[in-house]
Amino acid sequence: MPPFFSPYGIDAISVSIPYWLDLLTVIIGAISGILVARDRHLDLVGFVGLGLLGGLGGGLIRDTMMQQGGVYMLNSPYAIPAAVFTAVLLFMFPEPLDRFPRMLEWTDIISVGLFAVVGTDKALVYHLLPFSVILMGSITGVGGGMLRDVFLGDIPRIFQRSNLYAFCAVAGTTSYWALVSYVGVTKIWAAVVCVAITVGLRRWSLKFNVLSPADIDLTPHVMRRVNKLRRKAQKPGKQPEHNISSK
């Protein structure tokens, strides 16, 4: 079992997470896209396309914005082949996907948590500012799903009223950043906490039907308060007396 606290403290920020975790994240993200392709009855091209978007889309957006360290999907010898192989394999043998009707729901949010880890970690390795770190982690977490929805002609889920979908990514990203940067927790355990928070918040919001707010208009409430204060200020009152004393 890996140690919980890093013996190097926050100096371990500059050490990237294990490569196998990157690859596992790509595969799970690809499966989430493939499940949507299966649900939409797409052909092999659709399976491969959504597998690539789900597995590599978030990282592509992150790397394009950061412009540091190269583009992971192009530099890695395994990322694209892993996503394509997973898509082709599940296209030919889709029965395991059909056995679990809620598999999409689980793989989708787990992939968000894992992508939040790798996105936050790369931003930490290149010493970005805290808000930039959280932004990169969150975008990496939801970016693949966003591109998938756009390519399917749907409104991305992060822009719709949902069960705290994007908020889960922000919360997981923030936890990873704080644990690694300030507490000195090893990156493996920080990743476990990040995924647990992301998945846990999502499951909690689904269980209790907690939805992100939408169609809010505070204008009438604010205007009523303003009008009330204005009427109160306009009421006639006793004018203060000004005593002018002559010297």
Locations of regions flagged by a protein language model:
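C-terminal ends of transmembrane helices
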Residues: 30-40, 63, 88-101, 146-157, ...
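Short, structured motif recognition centered on aromatic/hydrophobic residues
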Residues: 49-53, 60-66, 135, 139, ...
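Cytoplasmic-side transmembrane-helix entry/capping segments in multi-pass membrane proteins
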Residues: 45-53, 76-81, 101-112, 136, ...
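Short, highly charged, low-complexity non-transmembrane loops/tails of multi-pass membrane proteins
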Residues: 213-243
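The first (N-terminal) embedded transmembrane alpha-helix
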Residues: 19-32, 50-53, 172
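Structural signature of hydrophobic alpha-helical transmembrane segments
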Residues: 14-26, 71-85, 129-142
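Helix-coil boundary and interhelical linker segments in multi-pass alpha-helical membrane proteins
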Residues: 1-15, 64-74, 118-132, 178-189
